[in-house]
Amino acid sequence: VYKRQHFGYTQNDDRGYIVKVGDKAPDITITYTDGTRKKLSDFRGKIVMLQFTASWCGVCRKEMPFIEKDIWLKHKNNPHFALIGIDLKENREQTIQFGKDLKITYPLTLDPEGKAFYSFAAQGAGVTRNIIIDKQGKIVFMTRLYDPEEFGKMCEVIDRLLD
């Protein structure tokens, strides 16, 4: 159930999230495959899409080509946008191979212990999730699994925030 609310949608969410739309996003540490580390707060002033994924997740594998085509290729050169794939509980080599297998060009980062994931989702919650964060660091939209209608709404939210 979605209700329009200024830039995003409010969502009644019982899908395993421990955060909600309107919350300040937890300031997680993001570790790139080259070892570079950043805090989520380093991206303040940008629209950020966090994409939680894993190579063993069939739904993730189905969704990621759409993220590549409909979001990343459209916005990758926009200095006000960041897309960060976060690979749950896999090592560097697995993460790099996962990106190659799916021909993903957006950054896939490491979350070997699930610290980033469990800052947003409950223990035992499923992995296919996207979180859109506004320039002030607030959560404005969240998805669970891959639903084409919800994915389309997420694309609209990103487009509006970048207008």
Which residues make up each language-model segment?
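Short, small-residue-biased leader/transition segments that mark boundaries at the very start
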Residues: 1-2
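Short, ordered coil/turn segments that flank beta-strands lining enzyme active or ligand-binding pockets
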Residues: 33, 43, 135
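Thiol/disulfide oxidoreductase modules built on the thioredoxin-like
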Residues: 100-105, 111-159
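N-terminal "domain-start" segment that seeds a small globular fold
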Residues: 7-40
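Short active-site neighborhood of thiol/selenol oxidoreductases, capturing the structured segment around
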Residues: 38-61
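Alpha/beta-hydrolase fold active-site loops
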Residues: 47-48, 81, 128
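Conserved hydrophobic packing residues within short motifs/helices of P-loop NTPase cores
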Residues: 50, 84-86, 131
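Structural microenvironment flanking redox-active thiols in thiol-disulfide oxidoreductases
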Residues: 61-102, 112-119
